[in-house]
Amino acid sequence: YGNNGEAFNEMKRISNALTNLGYNVVREKIEASYWHTKAPFKEDGDTKMPEGCYFEVHLNIECTNEKLNKLNQISKSTNCHLSKNAFKIIDDNTFTIMMTYRSYEQMFEDFEEHLNFIKDTLQFNQFKLEKEIIEFAIYDTKINHDKLWLEA
């Protein structure tokens, strides 16, 4: 969508359609690229995250049963959330699992610095990063919806 208004209208259209079908919509959310105009960057003179917004990164990591405890330790020590379920099964012992880091306060440069620390820690411990998706949430009706999930 070309602008925030169009994205918001499409989100509302989908939400209303689901409600009309009898579904209980518990959350409405719009995620954008991290370079969205609303995203805070120090180089632009920003000093504060816009209200209700946050940066988030999803890391798909190749793991084995033997290394899962180590990955869990890394996740906790870097303030990340490690998914409870495998994202993709590769073989009987190897799988891809998702690790998520979210920041409600950091400017992008600080977020990126911590992300690089996470990736360096994974590489040092010989984990293979398969995919990285960085997002900027510009609208979220339940910003604390994932709070328990992220802290688990």
Where in this protein do the model-derived segments appear?
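Long, contiguous binding/interaction regions
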Residues: 1-152
